[in-house]
Regions:
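Conserved positions within compact, well-structured domain cores
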Residues: 19, 23, 29-234
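Surface-exposed interfaces of beta-sheet-rich extracellular modules
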Residues: 1-20, 192
Length: 234
């Protein structure tokens, strides 16, 4: 259903099958005879294999509704051509590079996110249309995206659930604001978001926090902030 981006299950007429076979001529079969020439096949998890400068990083995938997402944040210290990204200690205006928290989460400045040199082939930084499709499919429930341990913003505030039933694996890595990151970790999660022209960073970024079960937005603050990148396949 392209209107609400959902799938409807229709009962089949065939018996349940536990095996799929690939024949020597390339045909796919659900059953074989002794005379068939069957190829040995190694089934692998659906992953993105990102190779940069001799370093291989595998990103598992998740399908949510009609969308395909990486199931973890981008973790690259090199551009796709192998050139090194500058490693930074703080965010300042017009700077390009990446930052790492003490727990080794990766954050990128706006100039890197817009460079066109950081993402694996066929993968994109989501725009608000992409996020809204995801949000509508999950009926706005942030808990379905949240994973890991979320801590309260204030002592008296309640932490909302993190069920990760979608498989998105949204860990509260926080963000960098200037030189500060630790205060935001385990409480916040934000991702760089393009505007709907896909040519520039939107004024708002995708955002979740521990005390609400709502998928929100936050000011991008491109001169002072660095966020994680979560990729979508288009």
């Amino acid at each position: 259903n392209m209107e609400d981006h959902s799938l409807t299950y229709v009962d089949g007429t065939l018996l349940a099958r536990n095996n799929v076979y690939v024949l020597a001529d390339g045909a796919i079969s659900l059953s074989v005879t002794l005379a068939d020439d069957v190829l040995p096949v190694l089934a692998l998890e659906d992953v993105v294999r990102d190779v940069r400068g001799g370093v291989i990083h595998n990103y598992p995938l998740v399908k949510i509704g009609t969308q395909y997402w990486m199931r973890s944040n981008l973790e690259a210290s090199l551009y796709v051509n192998g050139d090194a990204l500058p490693k930074l200690n703080q965010v300042t205006a017009n700077i390009a590079g990446y930052l790492q928290s003490t727990t080794e989460h990766y954050f990128y400045t706006a100039n890197v996110a817009l460079s066109g040199r950081i993402l694996p082939t066929h993968w994109s930084i989501p725009n608000w249309e992409d996020w809204n499709i995801l949000k509508d499919y999950l009926k706005g429930e942030a808990s379905l995206l949240k994973s890991g341990i979320w801590l309260s913003l204030k002592t008296e505030e309640q932490v909302q659930p993190a069920t990760n039933l979608s498989g998105f694996n949204g860990i509260p890595v926080g963000m960098y604001v200037g030189a500060f990151q630790a205060d935001y970790e385990n409480k916040h999660l934000a991702y760089w978001t393009l505007d709907n022209t896909n040519a520039t960073i939107d004024t708002k970024v995708f955002y979740m926090k521990s005390d609400t079960n709502i998928i929100e937005e936050s000011n991008a603050g491109i001169d002072t902030k660095a966020f994680a990148i979560r990729c979508i396949r288009k």
